[in-house]
Amino acid sequence: MISENIKYIGVNDHIIDLFEGQYIVPNGMAYNSYVIIDKKIAVMDSVDQKFTEEWLSNIEKTLHGKTPDYLVVHHMEPDHSANIVSFLNAYPNAFVVSSDKAFKMMAQFFGTDFADRRIVVKEGDTLNLGKHTLNFIAAPMVHWPEVILSYESNEKILFSADAFGKFGALDIAEDWACEARRYYIGIVGKYGTQVQALLKKATALDIKTICPLHGPVLTENLEYYLDLYNTWSSYTPEEEGVMIAYTSIYGNTKKAVMLLAEKLKENGCPKVVVNDLAREDMAEVVEDAFRYSKLVLATTTYNADIFPFMKEFIDHLTERNFQNRTVAFIENGSWAPTATKVMQAMLEKCKNLTLSENTVKILSALSYESEAQIDNLAKELCK
């Protein structure tokens, strides 16, 4: 229960193994839906198609014979919109409330834009339910173009769509920030400029509760969550520290990485994180890259290019607008090492990166010269 007249009617998904076909979710997912009970009744979003019957049952049990007047659709991704048709079949007198772009997407998903049962809203429009009034806020590209949020002005609740969401079902307790960060960086991270614009709108409101489409309802210390979103969306490092991402074929590059990590700690670096790109969850490593202030990329020259896992990792960074960090490089090659050159070229599109003065070149295995380069790099990164 959110309040006396606003109820939770969402579901937990412990069947899912990959969210959006790529993100590992060991603790499942929550698809959140809410209902506002007033003179007019508004259901806020639907849930994934696997849970049609459970969701409709939740509505029925919560309303005790009353029928909804509206289904408000904040976001058209199928994990939130899949049951629009099922809802309208169950409640033939109800209307769908959403943005113009959302109705165009409905025509694509369902073959109809519900022309005779729709209410199109835009920034600044309101929907009066009685004591409760929904004020609509445009949130394009957070993280789809049709997205709207709604602010209920009586109880000061922000229905935030995918913003402030996280991985994980609601029946498993876990720290919010870790899985919210991985969710944000992976799914919304590219759109920092748009999130910044939304935060300006949100901070102008008197918000007591945030109701996202994934993750727990947020009711306490909201400034903490808003501050984290400001940090993430402005591409500001969350913590001082060095994250080393590496690939290693026969173990020699790994030895160099471990030596660097040891030297960084000896030189007083506040935090050192080492990730093997071949074995760690890629989304977790991308999350770490955005979390810390400095990044070391260590890989081998491979087919006159770089090792595939490193290439994939850098692609994840660049497509999410990685910026405002210090980046250093370790390359390994037995006859024509070019990995540093390739990695630097891939990062050219990133804004405000500081490339380290020192780099490390390994010719097959560690040597006196490359160990000295590692020592110099550690000292530079710990300044």
Regions found by a protein language model. Name each.
Residues 1-4, 98-147, 191-199:
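Metallo-beta-lactamase
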Residues 2-61, 149-152, 156-160, 253:
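Conserved beta-strand hairpin/beta-sheet module of binuclear metal-dependent hydrolase folds
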Residues 39, 50-97:
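Active-site metal-binding motif and surrounding structural segment of the metallo-beta-lactamase
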Residues 40-42, 70, 132, 156-159, ...:
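Structural motif
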Residues 44-46, 68-76, 96-99, 158-162, ...:
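Active-site neighborhood of phospho(di)ester-bond hydrolases with catalytic His/Asp-centered motifs
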Residues 143, 147, 163-190, 233-238:
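Active-site-proximal loop/helix segment associated with metal-binding centers of metalloenzymes
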Residues 170-210, 214-217, 259-275, 285-383:
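FMN-binding flavodoxin-like domain, especially the glycine-rich phosphate-binding loop
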Residues 211-238:
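Short N-terminal or domain-adjacent regulatory/targeting segments
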